[in-house]
Swiss-Prot record:
This is Integration host factor subunit alpha. CDD domains: IHF_A. The keyword Transcription regulation applies. One of its GO terms (biological process) is DNA recombination.
Amino acid sequence: MGALTKAEMAERLYEELGLNKREAKELVELFFEEIRQALELNEQVKLSGFGNFDLRDKRQRPGRNPKTGEEIPITARRVVTFRPGQKLKARVEAYAGTKS
């Protein structure tokens, strides 16, 4: 199974919408930049029919160095989480067990 890249997304925009390649690449970059900026501003990103990107604060917790077994603290941090929407879940589940 391969991975969808930003370059492939831009190529699809070029082919499907007739944008030139530079415009298609800029559109993809702008889309992701908008998501990044919203998250930087502590905003939730809701993409209808796809899912939500949220920020979650994780508290400091104890961890362990796997090599030495030494206990070390894992610092508090903020993480981005993604929760798929119902439509996305349904489409993924419809293809469960099929090979591409």
